[in-house]
């Protein structure tokens, strides 16, 4: 969702790179034209792309942290990510609302003239505003612990997906993946027909099930149309840095409402929808990273309260079995953060103490098989 980036900004976990078209990407061979299906990337193309090269390096660094075949295959699949040509989008600076070229052209002329054109390059395609898609390995480890070891043929929903990178990795392993998010930035970025639909299998992946990506913009589960587009029968629902108590139920007054997330439905309706959206035996994994909480004298930071916004009793009342509730994953996420250099700036200088300013809490619930 569009408030997820606050965590990265607060922690100063700034990823390298930035906006702007990669030199030569407009005409470089190997990058498909708009609407053409993505093909498997060659080693030479990976070497030519700073973004894909970075992801490959991150995957190699993170491999020693993996504890399951699922996360190992997830990281291995980075070698099959396609090159991406820059995309044009338009932004209304007053509200930070983004528009695709088609959406911009549909606006009346007075509004069109108020928009600023911007180029979203390959780095933004995979990292968007929220950092490395490979940071999903910790959430996937907890899913694997619940006998979710092979995604081929499985249906996965990401609530507040924030980036297509991890969705494409899962789809390349054979999963039918749906991402739902109201953020206009994502809707303006992922407009090519090749961004969704069937995804070619990653090198070494099973070919018995072809994966796919579906992207849905809107407020789930408030909007009826969005509920219909998302559908039911999911084997896994992921929520990373979205369903935080600080975002959904802040303990102090927050003046800037953009820091919060309004689910637009009651807790009961939301959890009942989770139950109905999961297949029997399906899992929900809520994985939240957060910085140190503010003291009583400091300004309240909604992103720093990473607890589940729902109680154990609420989950159980909705018919869901609680496997883990606000379980700590601090040590593992700090190891990951150091490998991804979340504690360093672009010059390699240490700017944050992850031992005292990076934490992770995870909640896992299951819809009973019967």
Label the model's feature ranges:
Residues 225-236:
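A short acidic, Gly/Pro-enriched loop at the edge of an enzyme's catalytic core
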Residues 252-280:
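A short glycine-rich, Lys/Arg-flanked "PGG" loop and its adjoining helix->strand segment in the class I
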Residues 281-289:
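Conserved beta-strand signature within the Rossmann-like core of class I S-adenosyl-L-methionine
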């Amino acid at each position: 969702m569009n408030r997820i980036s606050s965590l990265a900004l607060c922690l100063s976990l700034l990823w390298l790179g930035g906006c702007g078209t990669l030199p030569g990407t407009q005409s470089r061979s190997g990058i498909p034209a708009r609407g053409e299906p993505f093909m498997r990337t060659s080693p030479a193309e990976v070497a030519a792309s700073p973004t894909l090269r970075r992801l490959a390096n991150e995957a190699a660094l993170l491999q020693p942290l993996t504890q399951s075949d699922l996360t190992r295959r997830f990281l291995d699949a980075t070698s099959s990510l396609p090159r991406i040509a820059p995309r044009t989008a338009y932004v209304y600076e007053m509200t930070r609302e983004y528009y695709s070229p088609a959406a911009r052209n549909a606006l009346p002329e007075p509004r069109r003239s108020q928009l600023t054109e911007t180029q979203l390059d390959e780095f933004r395609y995979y990292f968007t505003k929220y950092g490395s898609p490979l940071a999903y390995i910790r959430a996937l480890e907890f899913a694997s612990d619940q006998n979710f070891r092979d995604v081929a043929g499985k249906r996965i929903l990401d609530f507040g997906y924030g980036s297509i990178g991890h969705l494409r990795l899962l789809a390349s392993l054979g999963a039918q993946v749906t991402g739902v998010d109201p953020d206009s930035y994502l809707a303006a970025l992922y407009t090519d027909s090749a961004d969704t639909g069937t995804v070619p299998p990653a090198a070494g992946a099973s070919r018995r099930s072809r994966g796919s990506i579906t992207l849905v913009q809107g407020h789930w589960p408030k909007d009826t149309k969005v509920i219909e587009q998302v559908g039911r029968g999911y084997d896994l629902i992921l929520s990373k840095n979205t369903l935080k108590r600080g975002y959904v139920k802040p303990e102090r007054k927050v003046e800037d409402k953009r820091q919060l997330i309004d689910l637009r439905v009651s807790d009961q309706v939301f959890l009942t929808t989770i139950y109905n959206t999961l297949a029997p035996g399906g899992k929900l994994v809520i994985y939240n990273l957060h910085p140190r909480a503010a003291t009583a004298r400091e300004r309240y930071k909604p992103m720093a309260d990473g607890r589940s916004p729902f109680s154990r009793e609420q989950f159980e009342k909705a018919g869901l079995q609680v496997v883990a509730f606000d379980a700590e994953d601090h040590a593992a996420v700090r190891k990951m953060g150091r490998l991804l250099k979340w504690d360093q700036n672009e010059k390699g200088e240490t700017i944050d103490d992850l031992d005292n300013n990076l934490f992770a809490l995870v909640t896992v619930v299951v819809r009973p098989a019967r």
